Amino acid sequence: MNRIKQTFAALAEQGRKGLIPFITAGDPDPAKTVEFMHALAAGGADVIELGVPFSDPMADGPVIQRSSERALARGVTLKSVLADVKRFRETDPKTPVVLMGYANPIERMGVDAFAAEAHAAGVDGVLVVDYPPEEAGVFAEKMRAAQIDPIFLLAPTSTDERIADVGKIASGYVYYVSLKGVTGAGNLDVSSIAGKIPAIKSRVPVPVGVGFGIRDAETARAVAEVSDAVVIGSRLVQLLESAAPEGAAAALKTFIAELRAALDGAGNTAR
């Protein structure tokens, strides 16, 4: 059983919900990425999503776009992100790490080479935003062969057929995008999310994490009531964008601890 599966199995046994924070590797300072990852874990993160910066992040809003631009300007690459994961693993062998990004950097490295290097670094899952599930069967097989979970997105516009396609190849968890549009946009409609989750869970045999639009403990708790996990990204990137460098890791840890407390107070209604 891999780290992601172990984590969600333990959460289910404890009646708790998963907390999955996202940060962009290398932003605002490449030398701080591993420290930030440890701060997230210490604050109570169950899984860490680490963004691989890309020059055309089409699914991301202005906040994460800016973070990608800053990281790229500082020389961050897919190889340097994998090196960060390897350094993180030296002192944290337990917290699952998922890389989130776009196909181009992986294809430039080569899918087979990426799978081997990601496995060696200690990556547990990969979410490629622009790999549609109906075209990702071979990619998913190669990831699983390297003991890496291929993770896919679903959205309010996903048809039953698309959900079923994802259910056939996803492992680890699926990421339900709670809003139409790009990351960091709009207001949450929890009742709409609650209406969609049963259709997903009836067709997808892995936990469902919900993200986009989650900004604080209140929205995290509300989403946790109807899902298996909460994903939060833009708010954390904003925090790092505005925090004083010397206090950024502590601010991350404090914010994640607040979300952790809120989620631990949420009911286990999604099971």
Swiss-Prot record:
Q: According to the UniProt record, what class of enzyme is this?
A: lyase
For this protein, the Enzyme Commission number is 4.2.1.20
Q: Which InterPro entries match?
A: Aldolase_TIM (IPR013785), RibuloseP-bd_barrel (IPR011060), Trp_synthase_alpha_AS (IPR018204), Trp_synthase_suA (IPR002028)
Q: Which parts of the chain are coiled coil?
A: none
User: What are the annotated GO cellular component locations?
Assistant: cytosol
**Catalysed conversion reaction:** (1S,2R)-1-C-(indol-3-yl)glycerol 3-phosphate + L-serine = D-glyceraldehyde 3-phosphate + L-tryptophan + H2O
A Pfam family this chain is assigned to: Trp_syntA
Q: Molecular function (GO) terms listed? A: tryptophan synthase activity
Name the pathway.
Amino-acid biosynthesis; L-tryptophan biosynthesis; L-tryptophan from chorismate: step 5/5
For this chain, the family text in UniProt reads: Belongs to the TrpA family.
Question: Subunit arrangement?
Answer: Tetramer of two alpha and two beta chains.
What the protein does?
The alpha subunit is responsible for the aldol cleavage of indoleglycerol phosphate to indole and glyceraldehyde 3-phosphate.
Q: Which PANTHER family match?
A: TRYPTOPHAN SYNTHASE ALPHA CHAIN, CHLOROPLASTIC, TRYPTOPHAN SYNTHASE, ALPHA CHAIN
The protein depicted here goes by the name Tryptophan synthase alpha chain
Native organism:
Burkholderia cenocepacia (strain HI2424)
